[in-house]
């Protein structure tokens, strides 16, 4: 007689084992109809799952945060079902849920086409409308291997054969299609109403380039049409804002084959880079950091001591000289420990804060490179704090305050905090990790922050707090981090003289606010759609003369503004003023200053703000005041 405890604490007793669907029905027919799955004692299950002992149960409906995962997983199976209906000779492989959707990989004798996607989506809609039940069965591994071999599904048979002998596997059937899956899935295909196939790509079987190239179909699925419409609009906006396209349009940077994953900064792009660097340098100074510079190439022996050689070698660029092995640094931390170790330190000096704009290199796979967002060479605002255990909480709290102020200045007001915990591959014992994770939890709690925990996603040397920014079109970007490291200082021999004259190992906090400057600039470009705030804009204003008569005055205005420290250009070409205005508007210049005979005679400028906003004619000093205000407040002008 199982007793089922519901989320509100109420209990229901049943005379025999009962399905999740039956519990939902006993509560109400509306809930039974809305049920997509359940959570039994913390585990997501199908509505067909049988509860045979006292358990806690939450019914998953379209209002539950877990609903999207079930719907997307089920829609991936619906796609595979449709492929087998339209292309019976295709073989199915795997189809997981990913962020905002799913994909499924297939083996087929010819490439799928965009027209095939249209036909498949139509078939998926047709199959969903049949509202066929999704039925779970369990069978022994060997029996499942034979089942899929008989179906001609060799990839599925290979997957199951890799499972240890003697284990059972679960299969899900809908109509004529059966797939291997752990589940859970929706109770019937009729629950799948909102989906779209997005694109085609290639993928190697099991991610190994030695294996066959499969065809990957990406899709998205949602609970409500308005959510999907918003997502598709966001994708459309993302394409318009793509920093690679804007980088070319605005003449900021470029890439070329001779330097994969490395950036050629043009003058305008480098201007943005320098503004970000100088801003972050002031943050270092205001927060009590001493700026340092460590070598980019270090001996293999140091990387072995730090743990990078064993845990990160595949991502490092290595070289040899005079029978010694070296590596380009992928991280700055070992170098900062060497600077710390160059002298003897007292507890009175702690916390000791080092900061560097450290240039790092990581051997990223060529297929993973993506504009400024994923590169092989980048610069971090990388800092390391050497402190005692008792100082961790106050240092993390101070960092948290600083990081939020920085993001506010760059235009990000929504920031989510996540705590990444120990990964499977790591240095240090569990006691050290317990201490490090508890220290970060305590600091966040003391700072009054809410946070989400991410098991397994910490760095190999320590847990970390991550700061995730939401941009202007709703996407999130992980930027800032602060990590507790009890391991590396000990591995590299860092010490300080304690109050009792004993030698102790300091705690090291790894911290970065923007992270990779290159990536952060890519995020800024996309967040602002290229309309950089005045303080960051490579060119803050352009002076345009209406005719040759006003060319000298235009030059005078430009020179006056440049002497006051503003980034100003002049356009004295013999072109129509409307043409020049349009051309510079496409370059997203914050302010255009139009001068003709009247302005020359009255020492004024006609000001047009970005987006075609006419601010009228004003004395040059008045425009300077407006420019200074926008720069100091780190704002606009916003495009209309």
UniProtKB/Swiss-Prot annotation:
Residue ranges occupied by any TGS domain in the UniProt entry: 1-61
Source taxon at top rank: Bacteria
Bound cofactor: record note: Binds 1 zinc ion per subunit.
Cofactor: Zn(2+)
GO biological process, one term: threonyl-tRNA aminoacylation
Catalytic activity from the UniProt record: tRNA(Thr) + L-threonine + ATP = L-threonyl-tRNA(Thr) + AMP + diphosphate + H(+)
EC number: 6.1.1.3
InterPro entries xref list: aa-tRNA-synt_IIb, aa-tRNA-synth_II, aa-tRNA-synth_II/BPL/LPL, Anticodon-bd, Anticodon-bd_dom_sf, Beta-grasp_dom_sf, TGS, TGS-like
GO cellular component: cytosol
Predominant place of localization: cytoplasm
Region listing for Catalytic, in residue ranges: 242-533
Compartments (UniProt record): Cytoplasm
Residues that coordinate or bind Zn(2+): 333, 384, 510
UniProt cross-references to SMART domains, sorted A to Z: tRNA_SAD (SM00863)
Alphabetized CDD domains for the sequence: TGS_ThrRS (cd01667), ThrRS_anticodon (cd00860), ThrRS_core (cd00771)
Molecular function GO terms recorded: ATP binding; metal ion binding; threonine-tRNA ligase activity; tRNA binding
UniProt keyword Isomerase present: no
Keywords: Aminoacyl-tRNA synthetase, ATP-binding, Cytoplasm, Ligase, Metal-binding, Nucleotide-binding, Protein biosynthesis, RNA-binding, tRNA-binding, Zinc
Keyword Lyase included in the entry's annotation: no
Pfam families noted in UniProt: HGTP_anticodon, TGS, tRNA-synt_2b, tRNA_SAD
Family: Belongs to the class-II aminoacyl-tRNA synthetase family.
Known function: Catalyzes the attachment of threonine to tRNA(Thr) in a two-step reaction: L-threonine is first activated by ATP to form Thr-AMP and then transferred to the acceptor end of tRNA(Thr). Also edits incorrectly charged L-seryl-tRNA(Thr).
Subunit structure: Homodimer.
Protein name, UniProt field: Threonine--tRNA ligase
Organismal lineage: Bacteria, Pseudomonadati, Pseudomonadota, Betaproteobacteria, Burkholderiales
Gene: thrS
């Amino acid at each position: 007689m199982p007793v089922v405890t519901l989320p509100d604490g109420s209990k229901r007793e049943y005379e025999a084992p009962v399905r999740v669907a039956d519990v939902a029905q006993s509560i109400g027919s509306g809930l039974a109809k809305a049920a997509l799955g359940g959570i039994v004692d913390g585990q997501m299950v199908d509505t067909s799952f049988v509860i045979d002992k006292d358990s806690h149960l939450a019914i998953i409906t379209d209002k539950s945060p877990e609903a999207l995962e079930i719907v997307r997983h089920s829609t991936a199976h619906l796609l595979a079902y449709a492929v087998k209906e339209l292309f019976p000779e295709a073989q199915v492989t795997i189809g997981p849920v990913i962020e905002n959707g799913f994909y499924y990989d297939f083996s087929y004798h010819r490439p799928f086409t965009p027209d095939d996607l249209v036909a498949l989506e139509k078939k998926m809609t047709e199959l969903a409308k049949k509202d066929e039940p999704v039925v779970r069965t369990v069978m022994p591994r060997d029996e499942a291997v034979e089942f899929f071999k008989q179906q001609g599904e060799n990839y599925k048979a290979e997957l199951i054969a890799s499972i240890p002998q003697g284990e059972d596997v679960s299969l899900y059937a809908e109509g004529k299609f059966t797939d291997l899956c752990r589940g859970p899935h929706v109770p019937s295909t009729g629950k799948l109403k909102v989906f779209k196939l997005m694109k085609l790509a290639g993928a190697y079987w099991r991610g190994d380039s030695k294996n066959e190239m499969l065809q990957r179909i990406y899709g998205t699925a949602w609970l409500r049409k308005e959510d999907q419409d918003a997502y598709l609009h966001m994708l459309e906006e993302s394409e318009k804002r793509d920093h690679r396209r804007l980088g070319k349009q605005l003449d900021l940077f470029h890439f070329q084959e001779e330097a994969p994953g490395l950036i050629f900064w043009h003058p305008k792009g480098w201007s943005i880079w320098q503004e970000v660097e100088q801003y972050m340098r002031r943050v270092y100074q205001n927060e009590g950091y001493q700026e340092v510079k460590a070598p980019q190439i270090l001996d293999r022996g140091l990387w072995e001591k730090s743990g990078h050689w064993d845990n990160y070698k595949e991502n490092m660029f290595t070289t040899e000289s005079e029978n010694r092995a070296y590596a380009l640094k992928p991280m700055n931390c070992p170098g900062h420990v060497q600077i710390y170790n160059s002298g003897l330190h007292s507890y009175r000096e702690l916390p000791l804060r080092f900061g560097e704009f450290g240039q790092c290199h990581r051997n990223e796979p060529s297929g993973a490179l993506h504009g400024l967002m994923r590169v092989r060479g980048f610069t971090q605002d990388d800092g390391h704090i050497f402190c005692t255990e008792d100082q961790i909480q106050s240092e993390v709290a101070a960092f948290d305050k600083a990081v939020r102020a920085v993001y506010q200045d760059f235009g990000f007001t929504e920031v989510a905090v996540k705590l990444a915990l120990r990964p499977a591959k790591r240095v240090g014992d569990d006691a050290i990790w317990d201490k490090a994770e508890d220290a970060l939890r305590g600091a966040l709690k003391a700072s009054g922050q809410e946070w989400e925990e991410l098991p397994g996603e910490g760095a190999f040397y320590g847990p970390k707090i991550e700061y995730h920014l939401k941009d202007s079109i709703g996407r999130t970007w992980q930027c800032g981090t602060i990590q507790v490291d009890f391991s590396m200082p000990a591995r590299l021999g860092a010490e300080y003289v304690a109050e009792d004259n004993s030698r102790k190992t300091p705690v090291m906090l790894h911290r970065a606010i923007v992270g990779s400057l290159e990536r952060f600039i890519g995020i800024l470009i996309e967040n602002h759609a290229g309309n950089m705030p005045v303080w960051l804009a490579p060119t803050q204003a352009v002076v345009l003369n209406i005719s040759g008569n006003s060319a000298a005055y235009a030059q005078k205005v430009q020179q006056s503004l440049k002497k006051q420290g503003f980034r100003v250009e002049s356009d004295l070409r013999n072109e129509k003023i409307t043409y020049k205005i349009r051309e510079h508007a496409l370059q997203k210049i914050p302010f255009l200053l139009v001068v003709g005979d009247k302005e020359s005679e009255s020492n004024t400028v006609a000001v047009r703000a970005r987006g075609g906003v006419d601010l009228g004619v004003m004395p040059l000093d008045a425009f300077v005041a407006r420019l200074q205000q926008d720069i100091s407040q780190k704002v606009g002008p916003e495009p209309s």
